[in-house]
């Protein structure tokens, strides 16, 4: 028997006019639907921008994206029988793009509007559109590359209790207050602009959620959320703590593929799609599992590349100016990314194409060493078989015409 579809989305309608969606974490957002323990259900989701990005050859939409109108999640769902202190086990049975939108996109935000991990080096907005062909994808904006997707939800989480929500706002607010002169946005605090508690919320509740609801941008230890873990694919199980009656599970931000780190921020292959799940409740699971943050079991369905076919680059806690940092994995990983870009630039790609590819292709990022002072060492393995030409390290590269990603017109 086909699973019950509990959320359907309309790609031609604004997200805030559709039922069963919301874009804040708050314990009082009304249930969208109820799910029985052990019931298999299908849930449709908008892409993470709510339809702001188009299938075209300009990055104007990426440059001008409204980051207050994002993460319209499907939910929250009541899981019947779930109570605070339990653990909710969500089995991801399938994830697919919507049949009427067989494409996705990866983007680089402009430094002044969101930025990304390498925005000091690559401040301009850029975009690549990917077409889906069964399990494979390819892009006219990054020619010479084709790979299978590891399709997954970027966001899956439960609602916080009122106490946990207050703690989030306290600690994230303190971080912002402690860094008044930072050149980076330290945290996204509650923001009433385009806050959406769902069409079932009355005016008073909508105002409450707008003023105190947590933004969905970061993942958090108490509920999971936007962790962007590429291995939460078909067949995986994610274990989430329950803090409110019914759990109030929400899901969204579906990805066709993503590299470890999702470094460009809008960096997976973002898509509208559907996810099929089944839930199990572990009573008293938070205590029994000594759980302080979510955990997961990967599924058996992943693209397989021979270990010997990953061309692997190293980076250390020494930045591009030669400054030594102490065991800084952020510096090391940024340097690893730059080493990858420098290598593949030799074949004819521009740096923005490679920045996008690093973010959305099935690369493997690892912390190799974190004890050998003063340097951390991180690695990035790039599967050479995603390329349609030889990229192995055999001397001087042959430069070929590899086109360009999309840029903004202004």
Swiss-Prot record:
Catalytic reactions of this protein: formamide + H2O = formate + NH4(+)
Predominant location: cytoplasm
Entry's EC annotation: 3.5.1.49
Name the record gives this protein: Putative formamidase C869.04
Keywords, in A-Z order: Cytoplasm, Hydrolase, Nucleus
Species, as recorded: Schizosaccharomyces pombe (strain 972 / ATCC 24843) (Fission yeast)
Cysteine disulfide partners in this protein: none
Subcellular compartments: Cytoplasm; Nucleus
Subunit structure: Homotrimer.
GO CC, alphabetical: cytosol; nucleus
Function: Hydrolyzes formamide with the production of ammonia which can be used as a source of nitrogen for growth. May also act on acetamide, propanamide and butanamide.
